[in-house]
Every structure is written in C-alpha cells, then in structure tokens.
Amino acid sequence: MKKFKKWALVAIGMMTLAVSLGSCSDDDNDYYLRTVPNALVTVKVTGDRCYFQLDDQTTLAPGNISKKPFGDKEVRALVNYTMTDRKDDKYGAVVNVNWIDSILTKKPVPCLATPEENDAKYGHDAVDIVRDWVTIVEDGYLTLRFRALWGNVKPHSINLIAHVNPQNPYEVELRHHTNGDPQLRWGDAFVAFD
C-alpha cells in the first residue's frame, strides 16, 4: 500500500508539473487558414494574363501570378487567396494567391437515342451529389462535389447528359462510369459543367 501511495503521489506531482510548465504560444499567425480553399472561382483569360470571376459581380486580379496558370483554358478552380491593399482598375481587388487547384471543367454530353446506349457509353454506377458550398450554379457553370466508390485502379468518368427531356430543357442527368474499377471505398471529387 505504501508503494502505491508513493507512485500515486509521484504521478500526481508529474501531472501538476506538466500542466504548470505548459508554455503559452503567442504565435498568432493564421497559417492554418491557408490550408483550405476560401473561394471557388472561374479562371478567365484575357490577353497574356488571367483574372478570377468570384461571383456574378465580383472579379479579382491575382497580384502574384504573372502567367496564366492553366494556359488559355477557362476553368473552375478552388483557390486560397489573401486580400491586398491594392486595386486594379479593370478587375477590382488585387489578391495574393496562396494556392490554386483546377477542377475538372467540361461540357455536357448529348443524350443518345436510347437509355441502354446512355448506360453503355456514360455508365450508370452509383454517385451522390454532396450538399456543400462548392455545389453551386454560378457564372454559367454547374459545379458539383460528388461522392462515389473508388478503387484507384482505373480512371472513372463523370458526365452530365443534356436534353434528357424534350419538354424540359433544364432537366439533366449526372452519370458516373467506374470503367471496371473495383468499388472499394467512398471518396469525393469535383466537376464543373459549362
């Protein structure tokens, strides 16, 4: 019993010491905020530079990017940026881009003659649309975060079939094709349709 009390006192003393010697960091930088995207933009190209269409009214000029990050292609992208004090006469606020990552951006595909042809060409494998801030219709794009089963052996394809209902031109169908990839675990991806 004496040994137990001795070890209990030592353990309590060590815990008290650990709590009392903890340091307080006054490192108040917001570095962690740079690890997540803070905007979904359309990267638009004009001449030898690009700008970001943030929403229907807001454009941003990347101040620290001197070339077009995706060539001459207009794409949707997730971006993490920091505001600056500078202004651009044409594009509004100037931002510093911490990082940018493009989203698969593609056109809708035509509806084929029969549902069987659509199944064969575009697939009919399980896909879920995730309710998220990235799932949005803006700037002429339908941008989706979607969830599917992946095996990472073969590339999957994702398509938006247009004109599936002649009576309703706004009715579309999202199709996922695993292309024979084993469906092992759930994972998310992004796609934007123009």
Pin down the residues of each PLM region.
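Bacterial Sec-dependent N-terminal signal peptides
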Residues: 1-4, 14-43
